[in-house]
């Protein structure tokens, strides 16, 4: 089931106008450093992106009021359009549009002040705790820690950890409905003993969502009654075979608004301005990725590659999962990527001679000056090498969260009864139809083919995969807008935000460099059949404009698979884009020679084949 946005839908009576009569929509995203306003307008019956305004976020001292940054960003929109939006008395926006001024709908997302920071507790690490973790991540939270009976820590260590972390909220799950409740009560008692205090001040009770065994709800309520703001919802795992994260996710969103946001500087005021509840930025981004899956009825893998974090989203057969790698990013967390991946894994993507120490010092400089952008081709290529590793690690982490339910198998031996082996993730690249990327490095790449290859190198798509990215950062804005007016959000997304980069046709399997890998026959728009013979180790671009579709017949060699099994032919409708069709015969997993000279030569061959960078400066660099 797709992540429901019903809990954000508001009674249409609270809107100043019906959605069909709306002319102007304003959406903002209050980020940790920048507040980004996006102004949308219905022109000739079609919703389009009109203009953007940005200003520094004002959550920190001396301002300590987010609405100042919002007003500054909206003022920029006013200056660029001449359209008056703000009330002169500073009481928010003019609502609705009256034919001359104002806006019909205002909504916002926010990640300022650290976003939503949660702690999760469950009974068994690989079962209820894992399901609770998925629910918290799906609600747009950063999960600080997962506490479970079998997490290997002593009770006093858990108490210390809960006390030290100061989360915004806690999610407690455990036990199936009607099962024994003793162990869940033990975890609840640990939480009570720790006396955790909320991050944004001790003036209010820490919100706790209880989504465990419903037969002990009363006992939980009695235990927590004076110290915490308790909300009980349906069990996340009512029976082992079923996961029900939606009620917990809905409660987390509501409490985020009610408790967390209302204590952040200026948010009380901002909440009075908006027509819909404020949504955590990653939840908005996730909803935008779901718009793609929902509209095209496909499996989607999406990524938000940020400066400090990498968010990965998957919608496979309607099941939405989000993961956040809070320590993988392209500016603030860039040295963390180096630490996690290892410098040698970054070096393997660089096609020119450079010392490891030199790369390491460049990345450390980037960390202490996070807002700098690459000034030379050399800088850009080093940054692209890091991006590949951040994306690879982000997906690796995502796969540990997007797993089949554990504890469901019936046939077990006594020895593995309580030992849940990590099961394979259901995110398999051959089943992914669309890859979508957002984030500065991907959105602002000098050439559109660059994100196409970076995402391909990092995630290794197989078979036929469409590649999209955003042109202007507004996925969170469109995600939150879609909760009120889905058709308007999709119209803007489709026409002004979603860039069709092209389609990747990639064969899975390995072979010897130069051996036959696959033959691709493309029936081009003019009716001619273009036949491409691809040898192992080759990669090639076939131009096909955005909006054009061609029939492709792919015949892989007997050890290669393009979706129908090794050596079996596949027919597909292939869609064009700014870069075109990328025929990838480099194999899966990707092979890079151990020998540095051979590796650099092979990388150079791929980069020149795709015209990834300007030819002469690249030739000069790899000499």
Segments and roles (model prediction):
Residues 2-27, 41-48, 54-299, 379-388, ...:
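Nucleotide/phosphate-binding catalytic cleft detector across ATP-hydrolyzing
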Residues 29-41:
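N-terminal-proximal low-complexity accessory segments that begin disordered
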Residues 31-33, 112-115, 306:
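Short flexible coil/turn linkers enriched for glycine and charged/polar residues
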Residues 32-35, 310, 441, 445:
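Conserved protein kinase catalytic core
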Residues 39-58, 287-361, 446-469:
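Glycine-rich phosphate-binding loop of actin/hexokinase-like ATP-binding domains
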Residues 304-307, 314-316, 332, 395, ...:
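Active-site proximal loops enriched in glycine and acidic residues that flank catalytic Cys/His/Asp
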Residues 318, 330, 334, 352, ...:
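Short, well-ordered loop/turn and helix-capping segments at boundaries between secondary-structure elements
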Residues 352-382:
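A mobile "lid/hinge" subdomain adjacent to the ATP/sugar-phosphate binding pocket shared
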């Amino acid at each position: 089931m797709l992540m429901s946005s019903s809990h954000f839908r508001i009674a249409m009576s609270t809107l100043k106008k019906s959605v069909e009569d709306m002319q102007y929509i304003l959406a903002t995203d209050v980020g940790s450093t920048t507040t980004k306003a996006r102004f949308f307008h219905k022109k000739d019956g079609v919703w389009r992106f009109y203009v953007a305004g940005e200003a520094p976020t004002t959550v920190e001292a001396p301002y300590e009021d987010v609405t100042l940054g919002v007003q500054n960003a909206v003022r920029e929109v006013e200056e660029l359009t001449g359209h008056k939006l703000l009330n002169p008395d500073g009481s928010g926006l003019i609502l609705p549009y009256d034919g001359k001024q104002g806006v019909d709908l205002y909504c916002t997302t926010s990640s300022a002040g650290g976003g939503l920071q949660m702690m999760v507790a469950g009974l068994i690490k690989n079962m209820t705790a894992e399901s609770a973790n998925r629910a918290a991540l799906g609600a747009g939270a950063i999960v600080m820690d997962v506490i479970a009976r079998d997490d290997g820590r002593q009770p006093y260590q858990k108490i210390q950890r809960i006390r030290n972390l100061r989360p915004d909220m806690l999610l407690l799950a455990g036990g199936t409905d009607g099962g024994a409740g003793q162990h869940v009560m033990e975890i609840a008692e640990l939480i009570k003993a720790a006396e955790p205090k909320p991050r944004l001040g001790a003036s209010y009770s820490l919100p706790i969502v209880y989504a465990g065994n419903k037969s002990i709800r009363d006992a939980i309520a009695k235990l927590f009654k004076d110290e915490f703001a308790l909300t009980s919802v349906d069990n996340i795992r009512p029976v082992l075979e079923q996961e029900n994260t939606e009620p917990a996710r809905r409660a987390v969103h509501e409490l985020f608004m009610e408790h967390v946001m209302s204590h952040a500087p200026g948010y009380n005021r901002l909440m009075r301005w908006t027509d819909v509840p404020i949504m955590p930025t990653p939840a908005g981004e996730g909803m935008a990725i779901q718009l793609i899956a929902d509209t095209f009825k496909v499996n989607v893998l999406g990524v938000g590659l940020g400066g400090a974090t990498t968010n990965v989203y998957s919608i496979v057969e309607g099941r939405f999962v989000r993961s956040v790698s809070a320590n993988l990013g392209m500016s603030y967390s860039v040295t963390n990527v180096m630490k996690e991946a290892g410098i040698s894994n970054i070096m393997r993507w660089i096609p020119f001679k450079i010392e490891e120490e030199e790369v390491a010092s460049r990345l450390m400089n980037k960390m202490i000056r996070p807002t700098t952008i690459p000034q030379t081709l050399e800088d850009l290529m080093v940054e692209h090498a890091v991006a590949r590793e951040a994306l690879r690690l982000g997906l690796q982490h995502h796969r540990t969260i997007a797993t089949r339910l554990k504890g469901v198998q019936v046939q077990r031996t006594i020895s593995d009864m309580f030992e849940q082996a990590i099961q394979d993730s259901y995110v398999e690249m051959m089943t992914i139809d669309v890859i979508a990327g957002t984030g500065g490095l991907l959105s602002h790449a000098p050439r559109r083919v660059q994100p196409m290859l970076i995402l391909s190198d990092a995630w290794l798509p197989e078979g036929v995969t469409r590649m999209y990215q955003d042109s202007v950062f507004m996925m969170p804005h469109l995600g939150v807008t879609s909760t009120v007016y889905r058709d308007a959000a999709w119209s803007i997304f489709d026409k002004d935000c979603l860039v069709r980069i092209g389609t990747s046709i990639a064969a899975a399997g390995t072979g010897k460099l130069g051996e036959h890998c696959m033959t691709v026959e493309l029936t081009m728009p003019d009716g001619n059949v273009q036949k491409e013979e691809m040898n192992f180790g080759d990669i090639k671009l076939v131009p096909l404009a955005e909006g054009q579709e061609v029939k492709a017949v792919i015949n892989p060699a007997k050890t290669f698979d393009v979706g129908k099994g090794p050596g079996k032919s596949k027919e597909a409708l292939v869609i064009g884009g700014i870069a075109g069709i990328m025929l990838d015969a480099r194999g899966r997993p990707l092979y890079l020679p151990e020998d540095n000279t051979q590796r650099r030569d092979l990388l150079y061959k791929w980069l020149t084949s795709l015209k990834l960078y300007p030819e002469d400066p690249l030739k000069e660099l790899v000499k």
